[in-house]
Amino acid sequence: MEIMVDFPGGSRVDAHFKSFTVETDQPTENDGQNAAPTPFEVFLASLATCAGFYILGFCKKRGIPYEGIRLVQTMEQDSSTKIVRKVVQKIQLPQGFPEQYISAVKRAADSCLVKKHLEAPPAFEITATVRS
């Protein structure tokens, strides 16, 4: 997959891939207009939505109602480096959710591909060339 990034103005940085555009910005105190999430916020949201996707798929496959299920994600950051040291994902299940599937729905969330990439990170190669 190829992602093309451009700079539409201010502190905006947008990513284009397939037929989608992911818009990002910075808060006003960081020279942005706060018109979109920061790239890091998009990254954190991708962890939560990925886990949610696996929870949804688990429920659909088994015919379990998924209405009322919520996933709440919080992060614990190192105050000096601002690096996230711990991500906590709490799956809130509605009354009547089948007891026998509680552990399995946790395993489904744990299967998230974004999370798997953090557990076995890829190598990065960065180059710079002048276009002709």
Per-range role (PLM):
Residues 50-51:
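Alpha-helical metal-binding/catalytic segments enriched in His/Glu/Asp
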Residues 1-45, 55-132:
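Extended beta-strand/beta-hairpin segments
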